[in-house]
Amino acid sequence: MSDIEIAQANEATAMWPITKVAAGLGLSEDDLELYGKAKAKLSFSALNALKDKPFGKLVLVTSINPTPAGEGKSTITVGLGDALQQRGKHPVIALREPSLGPVMGMKGGATGGGYAQVVPMEDINLHFTGDMHALTTAVDTLAALIDNHLQQGNTLNIDPRRILWKRALDINDRALRHVTIGLGGPTSGVPREDGFDITVASELMAVLCLAENIADLKARIGRIVIGYTYDRQPVTVADLKVTGAIAMLLRDALKPNLVQTLEHTPAFIHGGPFANIAHGCNSVLATRTALQLGDIAITEAGFGADLGGEKFMDIKTPVLGKTPDAVVIVATVRALKYNGGVALKDLQTENVEALAQGFGNLKRHIHSMQSYGVPVVVAINRFTSDTDAEIQFLIDACAKLNVKAVTATVWADGGRGGLAVADAVLAALDQPAHFTRLYDPQSDVKTKIKTIVQKIYGGADVDYEGKANSALRTIVKNGWQDLPVCMAKTQYSLTDNAKTLGAPEGFTIHVRDIIPKLGAGFLVVMTGSVLTMPGLPKVPAALNMDVTDDGKISGLF
């Protein structure tokens, strides 16, 4: 059965009403805002009632550099939650919301897979509770208000050539990366160059995911720099006097969404910034709520430990007020062989030599996560093509690093297939975690960037090209240099070149621009050729999707 067929069978016969899932967390129906029988948001009153409740343990799930198909990080996260529940624990999962861009493009669904999924699968992958639409509307409303300000006299003296704020769409559409607007004469606006980001790359997504309450949301929105004046002074949303309007559009989107796994483990799915072009973590509110309602919160960060993992540690944890007690790194035999130079078409053939060559990639990620002082477990997401010799090589190679590596078969077996991972995680949680920051936020911007390049990526140096040096001068001039940095980089490589696989050393990262995101509270460092509006592949996943006359969806994954 396909993922969607498994999910639909569960939804028809076994899925609990969300009120029953909530009751297991100690929540009443009055604490919920229901979206049908299977989805709910937590009310602000429920969130406020939890504010003084102590935290449980926190487990971060990250991964090695993936193949284009992904390595099952969300699947392992869900399966680990189900396995911990089978071990008598009270886990709560916290995941990101899928973006329609990858759903319709490369990946198909993004709610786990097989018998380790969150449900209702179709709803979550498509429109869910409307958060993405609210964000897109808020982004584009702000853009419209900026252009209206230009049209109505421009009292703030905004330079149309130096507007940073872009419009957004939650779909991959390369044709919208660079557009010209305001054509059609004097009544159609001020002509200028503009562009679209995918919604999950917009600063408002990061703001939503880092905001702790409505007051913090408004403060962060007000700080967003939308552009510069003719004399190069920053202009913020607060200067436009539209902070309240934008926050109003995001009021309900700020509330975490509660759903369940196939095995009824509670899961908060909320916020979805990409990890290659944003900070890649679900909302602080969702993770914090999971920590307060369960004894173990399991969350994931996007792509590999070099992207989402690093950003979770350096950007999210200071806001969350909690550091991980253990880290799970998801690895697959196929991805390590891919990093060892095997072509995609040959990944199902046994090749221990290539696996050994690609193991350097996993080793780099293990060392980078260990540098934070947190116990590490490796979860090998086993595929049917993996051989016993390949699996044993990985287990032995990790053992030489004093790291426990175990296999998981949660796609096929659900929580039962994740019991070995659960046991390894529980053992790791018994070890002390001595969290250490990677860098001092007060250090200069170049030092922070170089620290990440050397300690996380294994690189040697950083080259500043194009607009990067003038951007640095602007950052220092305005006193923004104390913010953490958010690296925008390809997910397929430790370098900024997607074709450079494995664990290279001595390379240079090329920085082409640095964009201040004062609302989010970080500086986005644009490297290589990474894009904030992806394109669709030659054969989009959308080509296999359909809906029957009675409304049943097929081909979502």
From Swiss-Prot:
The record, for InterPro entries, names:
Formate_THF_ligase (IPR000559), Formate_THF_ligase_CS (IPR020628), P-loop_NTPase (IPR027417)
Hey, what's the signal peptide range on this chain?
none
The record's Gene3D superfamilies line, in alphabetical order, gives: Domain 2, N(10)-formyltetrahydrofolate synthetase, Formyltetrahydrofolate synthetase, domain 3, P-loop containing nucleotide triphosphate hydrolases
Q: Which residues does the record give as ATP binding sites?
A: 67-74
Output the Gene Ontology terms for molecular function.
Answer: ATP binding; formate-tetrahydrofolate ligase activity
Asked if the Swiss-Prot or TrEMBL record annotates the protein with the keyword DNA-binding, the reply is no
The record's EC number reads 6.3.4.3
Q: Which keywords does UniProt give here?
A: ATP-binding, Ligase, Nucleotide-binding, One-carbon metabolism
Give the record's pathway: One-carbon metabolism; tetrahydrofolate interconversion
Q: Which PROSITE patterns match?
A: FTHFS_1, FTHFS_2
Specify the superkingdom. Answer: Bacteria
**UniProt keyword S-adenosyl-L-methionine present:** no
Q: Which GO terms describe its biological process?
A: tetrahydrofolate interconversion
* Catalytic activities: (6S)-5,6,7,8-tetrahydrofolate + formate + ATP = (6R)-10-formyltetrahydrofolate + ADP + phosphate
Enzyme class per UniProt: ligase
HAMAP family given for it?
A: FTHFS (MF_01543)
The family line of this record is: Belongs to the formate--tetrahydrofolate ligase family.
Q: What is this protein called?
A: Formate--tetrahydrofolate ligase
Gene source species: Lacticaseibacillus casei (strain BL23)
